Amino acid sequence: MRRALITGADGFVGQWLAKTLVAQGWQVTGTAWHGIPAVGTLSADEQRAITWEVGNLTAARDLGPMRALLGRANPEAIFHLAGMSYVPTVGDDPVTALETNVGVGIRLLEAVRAERAAVGLDPAILVVGSAEQYGRHPHEAMPLPETTPCAPRSFYGATKQAQEDFALAAARAHGLRIVTTRSFNHCGPGHAPIFLLPALIQRVREARRTGAATLPIGNTETVRDYLHVQDVVRAYLALIEGGRAGEAYNVCSGRGVTVGEVAALVIARSGVAVRFEQDPSLLRPADVPTLVGDNTKLCTHTGWAPTRTLTDIIDDHWHAAS
């Protein structure tokens, strides 16, 4: 039985990844900051199949606890997903975000290096980053390949870029088998409504309940690249198996869609008679107007390809919330 360690297994993507690994017969150890997640994405049987390590990975400043975790899990593959993922929250507390999004990853990689020297542990490691690392580029530059210069405009993007820099430096300097991602927008059942697409779905569901004719929305011209969470999980598994160590990969659909188009599709799929109206309070002045990725490298190196559409994302999320 193959063994995997997932940091942030209690998160949105972490639960879907754990679910998939359990179904494939992996022995899964998952870290959870706020406790074992409620039954939902994971069934009760899937929950029980996972060895949970509950606690705050930022609490310890030495490598002891992280090395002990690696000793218990003895992973062949590590998926480092733990971190702060909501851009405004990171902006409000960048010091904590730096420790969470960068410090934890550094300690994890240093612990792997120490365990390799001590007992020969040599796992494949996936470090998950963000398309926010790219920052702002002109519309005609889309879709962005991995060779595009990274110039993040948010503290969140900056922490993820720092995480990638340290991870790839560890791969070059110490030969750790690390692959990093620049993951674009992804969604699906279980995604929190603080993020755009699930927030739109939640507002339309509320309009169906109340009979509201209009709903608030931010900038409808912003263009983003969406993947179904199940395609994201497939990409992460493909990269653990076939990604090239020391390299970064876009995880994306390669297609851009405006927020207005997403909102219109949510309404169309719901069948609710409602329309969105722009609310100035929801506008983010620092937003990157267009962010679309080129997935050629991921597809070529691993054979991965997206299988789910934006309509699938909306339908799955809508029905899961019913």
PLM region spans:
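Amphipathic terminal alpha-helices
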Residues: R2-R3, L310-S322
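Catalytic helix-loop patch of NAD(P)-dependent Rossmann-fold dehydrogenases
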Residues: D92-E110, L121-A124, E132-T180
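C-terminal "lid/loop" region of Rossmann-like NAD(P)-dependent oxidoreductases
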Residues: T214-L215, N219, A248-Y249, V257-A264, ...
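N-terminal Rossmann NAD(P)H-binding glycine-rich loop of SDR-like oxidoreductase domains
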Residues: A4-Q24
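NAD(P)H-binding glycine-rich loop region in Rossmannoid oxidoreductase-like domains
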Residues: L57-T100
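Conserved glycine-rich Rossmann-like NAD(P)H-binding loop of the short-chain dehydrogenase/reductase
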Residues: W26-P37
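NAD(P)-dependent short-chain dehydrogenase/reductase
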Residues: H137-M142, D165-D225, V229-A238, G256, ...
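Rossmann-fold cofactor-recognition segment
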Residues: E46-R61
